[in-house]
């Protein structure tokens, strides 16, 4: 407020307060003027319906009409938008009308579940004009819903509501087959499963089968309501246009003889359908489907014996394969050299000779050694150069048992030591050694793990047999005793 005294000057804050008060008073006056102008508008004034205050050109861009400064208030913004909007030209009106009329056509509504949902949601069938403006093809023409509403005034097929914000068809929307809405028609199939009609399944000469079927259906369903028509559909015949649309939805139509019973009221059709469900439940009888509802799902009967046999065979094969893999894995694991075996020590000078001797411990090599003097140890499939190159010596189960028996039994350990000392001096091809080995094999036939041939495997980490401190040394500047036979594999 301004002060009356001359001494006190109005400060800047007081002046700002005065100006704000004046501005607020001006805004109030403008609001009152606009309200009076709105009351004086006639009923036919299009500005009454096409209020610019909505601002948004489409639902996807709600902030478009609210851009700009806010200091002057929403009233000035409405005035600017009212001045910006202009009625569309004739060409744009025609394009908008054609496009939206296509949206509401039967051809499009049958496929467009989204728009059909909005049509069914409103009891009067109205759809928002702003929603239609947000559609892709309409948005290419205009983004202002007021332009769309103005163009729809010129449509003959569509009509706007009182406030020009919603639109609907002038004709009612029919019931489409893809909708799960009950209709007045009842599809009856498996006719001749009825006890009163099964005798008519055989062709008769008088040709009155169809008439008797219709009489039975009229008598059966007439108790639920007034029947407008009964039609018999036979396979291979041309279907009526209204039934042709649902032929792809219901497999019974066109494939077997069935009947279409149409009632005058939807409630009567629903009652008849419920009655047929209770009658056909748990027994063979003719069945009925209410047109518009989901068709019954056919569940094929599964033969349990047929299904269980391949399943059991598959499980058996899997278990056998798994067992074979386990045995192979165990065999590979037992045949592979461990880090504690002397064969795995690459620094040992005796590794090559021991590896060659190990090849003779295989069953095939062992049999060839005694049965055929001229047999070569290379005939064994386990003594191939590839196996030697990989450093993997496949040992028979006798070898594994021999290792355990030699280490656990003192007597067997002594025998192993005797034969190891003999074989280190005597050539493996000596007849005396063969006879001695054959005698030992005969006496200990029941315990093959005590074979003297396996004693070479019982060695320490230095490459020496168990119980041997060092190998004998020969004279100086020589290769030791029996140097000419060192190149041969010792047993």
UniProtKB/Swiss-Prot annotation:
What spans are recorded as compositionally biased (Acidic residues)? 24-37
Record-annotated HTH La-type RNA-binding domain positions: 86-177
Tissue specificity: Expressed in numerous tissues.
Looking at the record, the residues that make up the SUZ-C domain are 427-485
The alphabetical list of record keywords is: Acetylation, Cytoplasm, Nucleus, Phosphoprotein, RNA-binding, Translation regulation
Q: Which residues carry this modification: Phosphoserine?
A: 56, 58
User: GO CC terms for this protein?
Assistant: cytoplasm; nucleus; ribonucleoprotein complex
List, as start-end ranges, the regions of compositional bias called Polar residues: 359-386, 444-453
Boundaries of each RRM domain copy? Answer: 184-296
GO MF assignments:
mRNA 5'-UTR binding; mRNA binding; myosin binding; RNA stem-loop binding; sequence-specific mRNA binding
Q: Please give the chief subcellular localization of this protein.
A: cytoplasm
Modified residue annotations for N-acetylalanine: 2
Q: Where is this motif: Nuclear localization signal?
A: 296-302
- List all Low complexity biased stretches: 332-346
InterPro entries, per the entry: La_dom_prot (IPR045180), La_HTH (IPR006630), LARP6_RRM (IPR034880), Lupus_La (IPR002344), Nucleotide-bd_a/b_plait_sf (IPR012677), RBD_domain_sf (IPR035979), SUZ-C (IPR024642), WH-like_DNA-bd_sf (IPR036388)
PROSITE patterns recorded: HTH_LA, SUZ_C
Renumbered to this chain, the Basic and acidic residues biased-composition regions fall at: 482-491
Q: Where is the short sequence motif Nuclear export signal located? A: 186-193
Per the entry, what this protein does is: Regulates the coordinated translation of type I collagen alpha-1 and alpha-2 mRNAs, CO1A1 and CO1A2. Stabilizes mRNAs through high-affinity binding of a stem-loop structure in their 5' UTR. This regulation requires VIM and MYH10 filaments, and the helicase DHX9.
The entry's free-text remark on domains says: The RRM domain mediates the association with collagen mRNAs stem-loops.
Q: How does it assemble?
A: Interacts (via the HTH domain) with VIM/vimentin. Interacts (via C-terminus) with non-muscle myosin MYH10. Interacts (via C-terminus) with DHX9.
Q: What is this protein called?
A: La-related protein 6
Highest classification ranks of the organism? Eukaryota, Metazoa, Chordata, Craniata, Vertebrata
């Amino acid at each position: 407020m301004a002060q009356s005294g001359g001494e006190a000057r109005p400060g800047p804050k007081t002046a700002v307060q005065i100006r704000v008060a004046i501005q607020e008073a001006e805004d109030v006056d403008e609001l009152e003027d606009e309200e009076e102008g709105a009351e004086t508008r006639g009923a036919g004034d299009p500005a009454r319906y096409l209020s610019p205050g909505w601002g948004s050109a489409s639902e996807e861009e709600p902030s478009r009409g609210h851009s700009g400064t806010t200091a002057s208030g929403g009233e000035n913004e409405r005035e600017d938008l009212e001045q910006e909007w202009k009625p569309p030209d004739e060409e744009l009106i025609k394009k908008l009308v054609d496009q939206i009329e296509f949206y509401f056509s039967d051809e499009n509504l049958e496929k467009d579940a989204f728009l059909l949902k909005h049509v069914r949601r409103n009891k009067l069938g109205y759809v928002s004009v702003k929603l239609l403006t947000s559609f892709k093809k309409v948005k290419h023409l205009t983004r202002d819903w007021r332009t769309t509403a103005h163009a729809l005034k010129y449509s003959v097929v569509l009509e706007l509501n009182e406030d020009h914000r919603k639109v609907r068809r002038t004709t009612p929307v029919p019931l489409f087959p893809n909708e799960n809405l009950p209709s007045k028609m009842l599809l009856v199939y498996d006719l001749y499963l009825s006890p009163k009609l099964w005798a008519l399944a055989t062709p008769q000469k008088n040709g009155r089968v169809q008439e008797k079927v219709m009489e039975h259906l009229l008598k059966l369903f007439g108790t639920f309501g007034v029947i407008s028509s009964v039609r018999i559909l036979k396979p291979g015949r041309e279907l009526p246009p209204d039934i042709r649309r649902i032929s792809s939805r219901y497999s019974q139509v066109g494939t077997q003889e069935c009947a279409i019973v149409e009632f005058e009221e939807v409630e009567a059709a629903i009652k008849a359908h419920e009655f047929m469900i209770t009658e056909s439940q748990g027994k063979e009888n003719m069945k009925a489907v209410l047109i518009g509802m989901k068709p019954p799902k056919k569940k094929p009967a599964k033969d349990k014996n047929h299904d269980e046999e391949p399943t059991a065979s598959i499980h058996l094969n899997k278990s056998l394969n798994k067992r074979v893999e386990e045995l192979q894995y165990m065999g590979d694991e037992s045949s592979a050299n461990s880090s504690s075996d002397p064969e795995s020590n690459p620094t040992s000078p005796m590794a090559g000779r021991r590896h060659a001797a190990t090849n003779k411990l295989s069953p095939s090599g062992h049999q060839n050694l005694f049965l055929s003097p001229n047999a070569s140890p290379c005939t064994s499939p386990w003594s191939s150069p590839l196996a030697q190159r990989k450093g993997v010596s496949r040992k028979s189960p006798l070898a594994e048992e021999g290792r355990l028996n030699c280490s656990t039994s003192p007597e067997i350990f002594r025998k192993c030591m005797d034969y190891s000392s003999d074989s280190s001096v005597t050539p493996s091809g000596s007849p005396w050694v063969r006879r001695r080995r054959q005698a030992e094999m005969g006496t200990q036939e029941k315990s093959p793990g005590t074979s003297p041939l396996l004693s070479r495997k019982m060695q320490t980490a230095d490459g020496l047999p168990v119980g041997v401190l060092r190998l004998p040394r020969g004279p100086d500047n020589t290769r030791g005793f029996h140097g000419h036979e060192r190149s041969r594999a010792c047993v």
